[in-house]
Swiss-Prot record:
Pfam families: Urm1. Belongs to the URM1 family. This is Ubiquitin-related modifier 1 homolog. Interacts with cer. The keyword Repeat does not apply. Keywords: Cytoplasm, Isopeptide bond, tRNA processing, Ubl conjugation pathway. GO terms for biological process: negative regulation of JNK cascade; protein urmylation; tRNA thio-modification; tRNA wobble uridine modification. Acts as a sulfur carrier required for 2-thiolation of mcm(5)S(2)U at tRNA wobble positions of cytosolic tRNA(Lys), tRNA(Glu) and tRNA(Gln). Serves as sulfur donor in tRNA 2-thiolation reaction by being thiocarboxylated (-COSH) at its C-terminus by MOCS3. The sulfur is then transferred to tRNA to form 2-thiolation of mcm(5)S(2)U. Also acts as a ubiquitin-like protein (UBL) that is covalently conjugated via an isopeptide bond to lysine residues of target proteins such as Prx2/Jafrac1, Ciao1, Eip71CD and GILT1. It is found in: Cytoplasm. The keyword Cytoplasm applies. The modification 1-thioglycine is found at residue 99. Pathway: tRNA modification; 5-methoxycarbonylmethyl-2-thiouridine-tRNA biosynthesis. GO terms for cellular component: cytosol.
Amino acid sequence: MDDLKIILEFSAGAELLFGNIKRRQLFLDGHKKWTIANLLKWMHANILTERPELFLQGDTVRPGILVLINDTDWELLGELDYELQANDNVLFISTLHGG
């Protein structure tokens, strides 16, 4: 099987935790089943560059990070169990802002 191509996007400050890059195209190992849970672990190991505690809490995103998959709230799609499909767009939006 070919690589699984997905797009990651970061907005509203979430990009600051990922080297200030707002959009990434990823090619993941297509022989593996990729869920959001697996993706978050991969992101932590490979591209999360600043203060992981502001993005992750345990095995999931921390409260205050909205996750949209193809413009749909991940809560409607099974959250961590959602199985990524080719050309999925996964958007992380931070609602955590200093005052």
